[in-house]
């Protein structure tokens, strides 16, 4: 019998479907394991090989955990609302609903061909009214708690897309070539800032890549500083400025306010008013990226007004510049050009004074000095002296003095801004509120408020969504009077903010999720997806989850316990796959040529899961040859089947088998799938070399390989006499004594702190241990950019690098 992967894979996919093999049991007598993919947006271009990487990884873990006795929840669904589907619909002239249904069918077919062990009974779609009824319900809970509000605000408007973009979305759209401008619009906004501190502190509760945590910390942008009142004598008022460096107050030589600051025009004197107004209007046509880019030349206008420095009484000119944003701090800054790069550039351009107040090793007229590790100079008056004090002391001394004088107050600020939640488009969840003639706003009482089927779904030129043109849907009367519905829709992120909960209880019509089921399954044990979602989906979902926690809907503080970011698979030209480059490798194409098992194995064998790596067709052919070698263990020749023997294993083969089980178990647990596959290849080679067709060894191999290449393992498991699926078998165990490989685990420290471990043969020389330690990924990031000044090696136990900034 030859290895006919096409018929074998169809056979076992049909078997799993018919027998509901991967149906998740509603039982609590087993330990649970919830493994989740970031569910896809079903695009018209279909899945390519890069998309399959994360799905393959989660499927391996799902199958592995089932074999270890876990009750596994491994679902799949579709994030189908939003701009991409609508843009494609406009481009092709096909209704987004029709496109979505077609694309979902195509995606599902590919995923099923890959043999992924999803429980398809739990499939969800964000465009299903039964699903988005609960998305709308959550919105109304936000509204009820004062966390959703409307506001006339300056927004990021994309004229080409005819919609508002959230701050987090602007960079992506600009990179795609869309122009984005600022304009005032009435918007629905979610008060994510109310949860800023919890979003920050609770990052300590989760096992996420440090890089993603840091991206969220930077986006939230917590800072401790002081709000200082600068008196404006000519206006009989003051200008409030927020600074994180009150210790440099004596070095402030001018103030800058944003063009949107409410006092911008008021502070402009008659001779400067026209110039100020023109500058303010020009700033409205720029995006924040254009205004704040580090390489952007500084621009600004002088208002003609002066403020008083409370530390030394000096008059400080007040300028308007677009590098200052109203959305952060107070929209006004004190400029200390000697010790801030932007302030120094601005001062140089407009010939403003530069005063050194932090002792610098060079002339601050020639270059800025921004380090905190020095001491204050030129910083004293009759009441206070900071001279000679380091930052750690001078900050508090100045803050205390300002608070005592009543001209300053310690405060905490965040860069995070409230989430602009409404979109002026058709293809999204309707926002379930009604506006009455008496000016009141009331929630829809009957959910879901369904999206009407309309023919003209293109965006309008008025700033309202196409729903504003559907009068029979838009207007109505009830017991409270005549009303007009909200025409904005929710953004594409809404449905993905809580989908992980709906998978737990997808058919519930009474609640978003049953409390007992939620308590059993939450939180998600392993969440796999791209790091590009760090400050979009991942932040939004954490926010909604915390609101639901406060409502008592969920029992955990965080939704996703462990996050793993898979690396991108590039095209064969080493570039990101894209239609424009012509380097996209469609999933269906390689499935037809090589089969699911080969694709699954190759995707995982390419390299470490977290790393970026290029596709190589020669590589998948090598994996196909490996599967053929596995096949020949049972079918050494076409038409002939080997007879497995029941004799005891030789001592060498016994040790080989137990070592393989141990290493493959460890590597699978750690998501080091490429090295697990390498160990399987070694094991197969040993089986062929030994010439032994030992049943125990062959069955052990099939059990180890089955999460990775399930179809061929099912077929061979049946061929050697089993009448039940291999999915019902337990994972093989190993004897530690037989698996011992004379290897030791070496702790690797950097400046005395444990940063990772490496394994090496006992007695390895110093140079081997140092080389292994330097290459260990968890260690390497602490060595990058550093100078190693000493290397300490304790044989078989420890490596310590003593480093300093290099």
Curated annotation (Swiss-Prot):
Top-level taxonomic group: Bacteria
Q: Which reaction does it catalyse?
A: tRNA(Leu) + L-leucine + ATP = L-leucyl-tRNA(Leu) + AMP + diphosphate
Kindly state the positions of the motif 'HIGH' region in this protein.
Answer: 40-51
The first-level EC class reads: ligase
> In the UniProt record, does the keyword Repeat occur?
no
Report which residue ranges the record marks as coiled coil: none
Which GO terms of the cellular component aspect does the record hold? cytosol
Q: EC number(s) per UniProt?
A: 6.1.1.4
Record's signal peptide: none
| Similarity-based family | Belongs to the class-I aminoacyl-tRNA synthetase family.
Q: What is this protein called?
A: Leucine--tRNA ligase
Protein's organism: Chlorobium phaeobacteroides (strain BS1)
Chain's gene name: leuS
């Amino acid at each position: 019998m030859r290895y006919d992967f096409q018929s074998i894979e169809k056979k076992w996919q049909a078997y799993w479907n018919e027998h509901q093999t991967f149906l998740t049991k509603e039982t609590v007598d087993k330990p649970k394991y919830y493994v989740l993919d970031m569910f896809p947006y079903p695009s018209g271009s279909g899945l390519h090989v890069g998309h399959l990487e994360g799905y393959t990884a989660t499927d391996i873990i799902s199958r592995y955990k089932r074999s270890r006795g876990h009750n596994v929840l491994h679902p799949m669904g579709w994030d189908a609302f939003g701009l991409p589907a609508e843009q494609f619909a406009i481009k092709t002239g096909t209704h987004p609903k029709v496109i979505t249904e077609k694309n979902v069918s195509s995606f599902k077919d590919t995923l099923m061909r890959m043999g992924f062990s999803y429980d398809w009974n739990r499939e969800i779609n964000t465009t299903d009214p039964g699903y988005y009824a609960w998305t709308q319900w959550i919105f109304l809970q936000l509204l009820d708690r004062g966390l959703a509000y409307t506001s006339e605000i300056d927004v990021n408007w994309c004229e080409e897309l005819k919609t508002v973009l959230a701050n987090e979305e602007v960079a992506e759209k600009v990179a795609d070539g869309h122009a984005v401008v600022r304009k005032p619009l009435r918007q629905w906004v979610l008060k994510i800032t109310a949860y800023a501190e919890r979003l920050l502190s609770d990052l300590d509760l989760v096992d996420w890549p440090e890089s993603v945590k840091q991206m969220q910390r930077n986006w939230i942008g917590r800072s401790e500083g002081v709000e200082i009142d600068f008196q404006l004598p000519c206006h009989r008022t003051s200008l409030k400025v927020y600074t994180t460096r009150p210790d440099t107050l004596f070095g402030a030589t001018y103030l800058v306010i944003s063009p949107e600051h409410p006092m911008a025009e008021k502070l402009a004197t008659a001779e400067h008013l026209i110039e100020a107004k023109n500058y303010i209007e020009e700033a409205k046509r720029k995006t924040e990226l254009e205004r704040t880019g580090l390489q952007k030349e500084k621009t600004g206008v002088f208002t003609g007004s002066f403020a008083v420095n409370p530390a030394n009484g000096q008059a400080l000119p007040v300028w308007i510049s677009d590098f200052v944003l109203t959305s952060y701090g107070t929209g006004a800054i004190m400029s200390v050009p000697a010790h801030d790069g932007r302030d120094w550039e601005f001062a140089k351009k407009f010939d403003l004074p530069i005063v050194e107040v932090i002792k610098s090793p060079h002339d601050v007229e020639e270059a800025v000095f921004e380090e905190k590790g020095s001491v204050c100079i030129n910083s004293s008056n009759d009441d206070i002296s900071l001279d000679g004090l380091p930052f750690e002391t001078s900050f508090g001394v100045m803050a205390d003095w300002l608070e005592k004088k009543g001209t300053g107050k310690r405060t905490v600020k965040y860069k995070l801004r409230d989430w602009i939640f409404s979109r002026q488009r058709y293809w999204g969840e309707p926002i379930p509120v009604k506006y009455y003639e008496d000016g009141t706003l009331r929630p829809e009482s009957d959910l879901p408020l369904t999206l009407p089927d309309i023919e003209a779904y293109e965006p309008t030129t008025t700033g309202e969504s196409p729903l504003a043109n559907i009068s029979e849907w838009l207007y109505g009367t009830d017991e409270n009077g005549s009303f007009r519905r909200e025409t904005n829709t929710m953004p594409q992120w809404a449905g993905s903010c809580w989908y992980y909960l709906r998978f737990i209880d997808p058919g519930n019509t009474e609640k978003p999720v049953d409390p007992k089921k939620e308590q059993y399954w939450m939180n998600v044990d392993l969440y796999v997806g791209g790091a590009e979602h760090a400050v979009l989906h991942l932040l939004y979902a954490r926010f909604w989850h915390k609101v639901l926690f406060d409502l008592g809907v969920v029992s955990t503080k965080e939704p996703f316990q462990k996050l793993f970011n898979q690396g991108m698979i590039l095209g064969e030209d080493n570039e990101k796959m894209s239609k424009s480059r012509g380097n996209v490798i469609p999933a269906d194409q390689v499935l037809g040529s090589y089969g699911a098992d080969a694709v699954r194995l190759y995707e995982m064998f390419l390299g470490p899961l977290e790393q970026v790596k290029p596709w190589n067709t020669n590589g998948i052919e090598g994996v196909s040859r490996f599967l053929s070698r596995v096949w020949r263990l049972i079918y050494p020749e076409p038409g002939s089947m080997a007879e497995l023997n029941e004799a005891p294993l030789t001592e060498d083969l016994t040790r080989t088998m137990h070592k393989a089980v141990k290493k493959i178990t460890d590597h699978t647990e750690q998501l080091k799938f490429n090295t697990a596959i390498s160990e399987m290849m070694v094991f197969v080679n040993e089986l062929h070399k030994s010439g032994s067709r030992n049943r125990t060894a062959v069955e052990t191999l099939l059990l180890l390989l089955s999460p990775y290449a399930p179809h061929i393992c099912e077929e061979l498991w049946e061929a050697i006499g089993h009448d039940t699926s291999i999915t019902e078998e337990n994972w093989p165990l190993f004897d530690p004594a037989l698996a011992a490989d004379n290897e030791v685990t070496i702790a690797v420290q950097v400046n005395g702190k444990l940063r990772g471990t490496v394994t090496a043969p006992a007695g390895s020389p110093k140079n081997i241990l140092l080389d292994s330690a330097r290459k260990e990924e968890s260690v390497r990031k602490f060595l990058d950019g550093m100078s190693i000044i000493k290397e300490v090696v304790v044989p078989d136990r420890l490596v310590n690098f003593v480093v300093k900034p290099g």
